[in-house]
């Protein structure tokens, strides 16, 4: 299976870069998945969790909003704010707290924020 290149960038710099099997993005019309060979598109992203599947594990990045450019071979995410939540990390609890704060500040839609926060807490 061909791998997809992905980068997640915020104004302060790069949050994540790598080669992945798939990525699920929080689009404004709902979540959608991207695999290698996807049609080209540019889309607006809402507050949510970017789910990244690598060869060995799943990784998660909380974003407050942004844009994604998808091509056949890569996904470039430009976000206003992002927190990488590493599964095997000493600062995991701190990352989850920062992700919750980022998402709570991103939207006044309490129902949508609650749904995303529940997803983060289950990681």
Curated annotation (Swiss-Prot):
HAMAP family: ATP_synth_epsil_bac. One of its GO terms (molecular function) is ATP binding. NCBIfam families: ATP_synt_epsi. Produces ATP from ADP in the presence of a proton gradient across the membrane. The gene is atpC. Pfam families: ATP-synt_DE_N (PF02823). It comes from the Bacteria. F-type ATPases have 2 components, CF(1) - the catalytic core - and CF(0) - the membrane proton channel. CF(1) has five subunits: alpha(3), beta(3), gamma(1), delta(1), epsilon(1). CF(0) has three main subunits: a, b and c. This is ATP synthase epsilon chain. CDD domains: F1-ATPase_delta. It is a peripheral membrane protein. SUPFAM superfamilies: Epsilon subunit of F1F0-ATP synthase N-terminal domain. The keyword RNA-binding does not apply. Keywords: ATP synthesis, Cell inner membrane, Cell membrane, CF(1), Hydrogen ion transport, Ion transport, Membrane, Transport. Belongs to the ATPase epsilon chain family. GO terms for cellular component: plasma membrane; proton-transporting ATP synthase complex. It is found in: Cell inner membrane.
């Amino acid at each position: 299976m061909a791998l997809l290149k992905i980068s997640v960038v915020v104004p302060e710099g790069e949050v994540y870069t790598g080669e992945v099997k798939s990525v699920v993005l929080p689009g404004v019309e709902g979540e959608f998945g991207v695999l290698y060979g996807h049609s080209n598109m540019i889309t607006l992203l809402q507050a949510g969790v970017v789910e990244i599947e690598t060869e060995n594990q799943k990784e998660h990045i909380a974003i407050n909003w942004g844009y994604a450019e998808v091509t056949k071979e890569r996904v470039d995410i430009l976000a206003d704010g992002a927190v990488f939540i590493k599964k095997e990390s000493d600062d995991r609890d701190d990352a989850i707290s920062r992700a919750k704060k980022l998402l709570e500040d991103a939207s006044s839609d309490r129902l949508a924020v609650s749904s995303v926060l529940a997803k983060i807490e289950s990681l």
